[in-house]
Amino acid sequence: MQRAALPVVLSGAATLGGCSQGVLDPRGPIAAAERLLLINSTAIMLVVVIPVILATLAFAWWYRAANTRARRSPAEDYEGRIEFVVWSIPALIVILLSGVIWIGSHELDPRAPIPAKADPLRVDVVALDWKWLFIYPDQRVAAVNELVIPAGTPIQFRLTSATVMNSFFIPQLGSQVYTMGGMTTHLNLLADAPGEYPGFSAMFSGDGFSDMRFTAKSVPPGDFAAWVRQVRSTGSALDDAAYAALAKPSKAVPPATYRSVAPDFFERIIDQTVAGPGKARGAALHPPARHIGG
């Protein structure tokens, strides 16, 4: 019996162990609010699930073949009190859940700015095959598979894809948002304290999907300024030629930085007028950039 239960115990421990860097271990206000929403929704649903399980066990025990005290009434097909309980409680649960989800969904709108004393930092995100490109338009630097942000500072993300549809997710900081070619989605996050938080693609996007990961490094504001100065003094510029090489499909790409980038580079990627996977399609169609919600 103990040996049979061992795999179940080990799988449960492994599952709970993964929560140390997931949605149940938030490191920002958005992720904390989402965890509370998840816990509240689960608790409300357990109000129905637990009584149903207990009632099933109780009915199975009471109406067992050996219980001669159990009364069988095959002629009865309606009982008002039972009907009231069966329909009213689920209806109330649905209404309560709807209210909780409605309020939470609007409060956690990914486009909504996060109130904070510090001015927000803008970061443009581009999904490539199979890596993430982060452009800092105000600092005019860029990084691949490494997101460095100052702790306690709201981060305003603009996201797009230079290839297939993808999904951007940092579980410990907050919401998952889709990226699409020729479009822009928006996301606002904040890291409460310095730390390193794993991020990844949450949507299958091809052969190198499993390696499409990055590290979000939250550092003190002074360290962020020092990092920007270091990036500006090393590496190469992110121009059309460098981007064309970067945009080629590749797996397990190590972190890299670019010391300079044109201020309109992100817009050119959206419009598909820069060399890359969407260049031919953009040259043929020249679709205007569309901006949608996160």
Where would I find each of the regions flagged by the language model?
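Non-transmembrane, membrane-proximal soluble domains of secreted or membrane proteins
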Residues: 20-37, 61-294
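Alpha-helical transmembrane spans of integral membrane proteins, capturing the lipid-embedded, hydrophobic core
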Residues: 8-11, 46, 50, 87, ...
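Alpha-helical transmembrane segments of integral membrane proteins
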Residues: 5-9, 40, 82-86
